[in-house]
Amino acid sequence: MRHTLLAALLLASAPAFSATTLTFQHGVAGYLSSQDTMIRSNETGSGEDSRGNNYGTLDYISVDGDDGSPGAKPNQGLIRFDNLFGNAAGQIKAGDTIVSATLSIYVDNPGSGFTMYDMLTDWSQNTITWNSIGNGIQANGIEAGTAPLFSIGANDGAENIGTGWLTIDLTSSLQAAQAGSVPGYGWAMVPFSAGSNGIDFHTSEYADANFRPLLSVEVMPVPEPGTWAMLAAGLALIGGIARRRT
């Protein structure tokens, strides 16, 4: 009887293997490592040439298939979260299993839509321009990945995406970054070629931190060696008791 109680206590005292959700939002809980901006190709509006301008200080991003009529002057968006992986509290550990990862952005102007790709070229929100990356971001396997991660809306001028929170599934991208298959430089948001109704959303510079881009990552931690040892001891003890009884 005493052995049975001991085994039960060993198993009961072992921590449950449950998933944990980590959140990363600029300016919240000490996290200050997100970057986001847009790059613009318009050089027709009022004689202004936007291609060499940097927009990293703005509190919004516009993803638009034609932001400067007449004709195909797109804006592209970029967003990244650095310092996601490591051994510090709140980071994704090397041995953790990433169960899911979602990016939530707050849309304050409805628009056509966009497609999202892994960024393969390093960039900074304080320096990148349409010209500096070479005529905008190309999904060519060099600047950005060739396979879309996410796509929403339609290739037209309608308001296909409404206002409010938009959630984007980036599980496969975060898993690839953890494995080292992609460099973890964030993501490019590329508008549809005829998506002339720009979608605008708040950036990490937005005054109210609660409406800034939010990355949520659900992870399953790897049990500590001591936990495995405790479970093994409990199971072995139960097995021994069962054998003696038979």
Which functions belong to the PLM regions below?
Residues 13-15:
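N-terminal signal peptide c-region/cleavage motif recognized by signal peptidases
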Residues 19-89, 193-195, 206-212:
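Flexible, small-residue-rich N-terminal segments that precede or flank a structured functional core
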Residues 223-243:
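A short, hydrophobic C-terminal helix/tail in secreted or cell-surface proteins
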Residues 189-203:
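Short beta-strand-plus-loop segments that form exposed binding edges in beta-rich domains
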Residues 81, 95-108, 215:
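A short beta-strand element within beta-rich, extracytoplasmic domains
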Residues 23-28, 107-183:
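Beta-strand-rich interaction/scaffold domains
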Residues 2-8, 227-230:
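Sec-dependent signal peptide recognition
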Residues 202-221:
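A recurrent domain-boundary module in secreted/ectodomain proteins
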